[in-house]
């Protein structure tokens, strides 16, 4: 589960881009995720990302009843050119149909700007990560909160002695981010942050009509890790190809949950449930009901 931005404090964790970074629980079952979130959520008084967060008793939402819940299938989350696999799309659509059998109201809701989310994310993450990691030594400046000095020291040592161990993707991000800052002086970062407000508004408008958005978590099944001697272009492509549906909600801060919904060719397929800001209880409720309805490993 990626909770609403700021619901879980980020204190002490390694940051990448403060407006995108989230921490959340991972577990085998929805019940365990809900229980973990009850422990993790809430203000700690040290993380400036947290603003009027609203933690709840998430385990109480796991009633198994989703009668009348409005589920919206987002077509823009399917059929990504050159990325989406037909078996993944089909399995997620069938899984979404199962919600109807459980009493929910399932419909299609188009959000054209969803396709722009990855481009907005790229502009923010590339320049933001460069400023925070390269020039800010992983913690940055100009914010009030708890600075983890041990992390600063450790990262500084790594820069001095092991910078070449950074992944090909990270090296590209830092080089491109430095170029964008030097050449355009933050203009495209600023434009992307402004567009993030429009993207959030587009999803919020959809949430006037539905309670939960549905799409594949990844457009494809798990791919092979590139060989150690693979061209850097292949390494970077493998690293970034999986982000298309997930990263827009880093940008907007909406909660998003991966729900296993079946197996194809021996590999798991994930369905992503997205909720309103601080709507974790709703997507956990939907996930729990779905999870209880069948054995996804035999689907």
Could you say what each language-model-derived stretch is?
Residues 39-247, 251, 278, 282, ...:
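Amidase signature
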Residues 1-43, 252-263, 267-270:
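Short glycine/serine-rich loop segments
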């Amino acid at each position: 589960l990626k909770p609403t931005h700021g619901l879980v404090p980020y204190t002490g964790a390694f940051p990448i881009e403060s407006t995108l970074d989230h921490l959340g629980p991972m577990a085998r079952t929805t019940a365990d995720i809900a229980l973990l979130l009850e422990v993790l959520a809430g203000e700690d008084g040290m993380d400036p990302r947290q603003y009027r967060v609203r933690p709840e008793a998430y385990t109480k939402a796991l009633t198994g009843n989703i009668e009348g819940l409005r589920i919206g299938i987002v077509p823009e989350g399917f059929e990504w050119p050159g990325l989406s696999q037909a078996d993944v799309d089909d399995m997620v659509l069938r899984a979404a149909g199962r919600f109807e059998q459980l009493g929910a109201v399932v419909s299609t809701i188009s959000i054209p700007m969803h396709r722009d989310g990855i481009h907005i994310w790229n502009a923010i993450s590339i320049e933001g990560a460069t400023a925070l990691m390269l020039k800010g030594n992983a913690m940055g400046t100009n914010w009030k909160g708890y600075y983890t000095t041990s992390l600063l020291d450790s990262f500084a040592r790594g820069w001095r002695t092991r910078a070449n161990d950074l992944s090909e993707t990270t090296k590209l991000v830092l080089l491109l981010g430095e170029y964008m800052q030097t050449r355009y002086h933050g203009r495209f970062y600023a434009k992307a942050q402004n567009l993030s407000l429009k993207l959030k508004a587009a999803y919020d408008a959809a949430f006037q009509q539905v309670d939960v958005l549905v799409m594949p978590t990844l457009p494809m099944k798990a791919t092979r890790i590139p060989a150690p001697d693979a061209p850097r272009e292949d390494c970077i492509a493998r690293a970034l190809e999986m982000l298309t549906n997930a990263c827009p909600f880093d940008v907007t801060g909406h909660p998003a949950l991966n729900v296993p919904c079946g197996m194809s060719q021996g590999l798991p397929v994930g369905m992503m449930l997205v909720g309103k800001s601080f709507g974790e209880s709703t997507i956990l409720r939907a996930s729990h009901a779905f999870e209880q309805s069948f054995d996804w490993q035999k689907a």
